């Protein structure tokens, strides 16, 4: 145990969202997801317009983001809401396609017990981004596809 760990009370340590989730699985999730995004007629133009062929840095950032979300590493320091608000023109169908594709990859990468935890985090994030980009404070996010990835 490091000196820093000794100073943190056990009940205050941040635990992973699920004990079976590993950094390797998160890397695989991000790699597979964005590999399929690049083949998706709806999602690829949205991402490519911002990434402009520089997928390496984007994938590294997304891996850090998902490690922060699922493993509680705290390494991601970005601000995803303003980034997504600047995109403009996102439609409900874009979010539905994103969640549907994400669910498919989660089903391939994670253990069955971990899948609902990962999907719930993704849906919570998608709802937050949708609310920020919709501009409608009283609106409800679209219904996410429920029959995929679980």
Give the label of every model feature segment.
Residues 1-150:
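Core of compact, soluble alpha-helical bundle domains
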